[in-house]
């Protein structure tokens, strides 16, 4: 029994050590790179069934001709360009710019900034007012038609 436990420990130890190293490596990434990794993980790679979304959730715009079977490097490049465009839009919000950029990438800029009859989001209003207690407003975006979305 002792030998079995000893063998199991040494079989599992490298895997546990590797997972710990991956967490440390993730924590050492710059914030923008962590955002890219998170989007890739939760969004996943979109195939033909997800049209008009391609790559890692890029919504095709008028005049764009990206294929749904694009290579991973192109999808990565497109994701980074989209996130950087969102970041440029929200950079005036300082330390919250990346948070707002990621949220806008997922739900759309209009849901955050408001458009037409859609008012500015309560989350953005709290951030502008300096209120750091906006957790409930942030997680309210994880619902679609009343159902909680995974990711």
Annotate the PLM regions.
Residues 105:
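Hydrophobic pocket-lining residues within nucleotide cofactor-binding pockets
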Residues 87-92:
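Short helix-to-loop capping/linker segments positioned immediately adjacent to catalytic or ligand/cofactor-binding
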């Amino acid at each position: 029994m002792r030998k079995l436990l000893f063998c199991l420990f040494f079989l599992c130890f490298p895997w546990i050590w590797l997972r710990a190293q991956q967490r440390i490596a993730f924590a050492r990434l710059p914030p923008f790179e962590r955002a890219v990794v998170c989007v890739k993980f939760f969004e996943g790679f979109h195939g033909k069934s997800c049209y008009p979304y391609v790559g890692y959730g890029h919504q095709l715009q008028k005049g764009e001709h990206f294929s749904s079977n694009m290579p991973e490097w192109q999808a990565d490049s497109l994701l980074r360009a989209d996130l950087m465009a969102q970041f440029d839009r929200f950079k005036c919000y300082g330390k919250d710019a990346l948070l707002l950029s990621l949220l806008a990438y997922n739900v759309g800029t209009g849901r955050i900034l408001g458009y037409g009859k859609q008012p500015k989001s309560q989350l953005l209003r709290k951030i502008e007012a300096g209120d750091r207690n906006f957790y409930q407003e942030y997680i309210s975006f994880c619902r679609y038609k009343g159902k909680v979305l995974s990711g």
